[in-house]
Structures are given as C-alpha cells and as structure tokens.
Amino acid sequence: MVEERLQGVRFFEFLTEEEREEFAEGSELVTFEAGEVIIEEGGEPGSLFVLTSGRVEVSKSITGGRERLLAEIEATGERTVVGERGLLGESGASATVRAASRVEAIKIPRKTFRRMISEGRPAAFRLSYRIARTLAHRLTRLDEEVVEAIRELERRGETDLEAFRDKLMTDWAV
C-alpha cells in the first residue's frame, strides 16, 4: 500500500520500483486532522512526510510570539513533501507544518532513512541527493527574495532592521 502511494509522487519518480519498496518497508501511512501539528518549529529533527491528500500550512514564529504564514501546500501540487531537513540535518525544524484540512501522508522516519544510509543502500543516497537539490533551489530562491526585499526597502528609504526583518518574514515563501 505504501509503495503504491510512493509510486504516484513526483518527488520520488527517480526511484526504481525496488527502491520505492525499500522505503515503503520502513514507512507508515499516517493521518492528521485539520489543525493538527505535523512538524513543530524548533522540534527535534524527524521524519519526511509525503503528502498524498489534503493541504498543509507552513508558518514561522516572528517578533512578539506572532506566527507568520509562509506557504500553503496541496498534496496534489509539485511540492508534496515536508520535513526534508529533518532527515539530513541535526538542527530543529525551521517552521511549523500544520494540517489545514484532513491530511493523509506517508511517514518516512529519520531512523529508517539513517539505517538505509548506514547499510549503504543506493536509494537513500539518491534521496539525499534529491533533497539537497531541492534545498539548494529553495536557498537560491530565498537569496533572490532577500535581495529584492533589501532593494525595496532601499527604494523606500528604510534602513530599520526591524522593518527589513518583518518584510523578509512576510514575503518569504517555503
């Protein structure tokens, strides 16, 4: 069942059927109800979630304990995974991911991924490469957005760091 669901996910199209089966063995189907937190900002590095249905919201805490919505992700969209950093990194989650509707997902635990890496499984290394490319693309986009935010603030004659920070958090998209 998990392997069949992975087969239809664009993010995993580079895997062979056998490699998808390897991931499916250590994965599980999970469901989150609307409002339920899937990943909590600052939380321990955790699992990769492959969204198969539903919609999630990605938000970040900003000044004064406020939360800023960064993105909404539909399971049917091009980006159908959340939690990529949790597989590769050691730092806490950079944002909160919350179910905006009922969400069904495939959970690939960090433990499963790390075991596959330690066993030298090519599928895990291929997934690492795919995640690295995705993160590099996002970093490039973020750099462009930061430069644009600075230019806009300079055009308006603003030099206040707080104004820049708020502008960055408002316009930053995951």
Say what each PLM segment does:
Residues 145-174:
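Phosphate-/nucleic-acid-contacting segments
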Residues 1-29, 33-34, 172-173:
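Cyclic nucleotide-binding regulatory module and flanking cytosolic helices
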Residues 37-101:
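Cyclic nucleotide-binding regulatory domains
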Residues 25, 29, 87-90, 118:
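Short, intrinsically disordered, mixed-charge
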Residues 7, 24-25, 74, 98, ...:
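Alpha-helix boundary recognition
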Residues 20, 93-94, 111-153:
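A small-molecule sensor/coupling module
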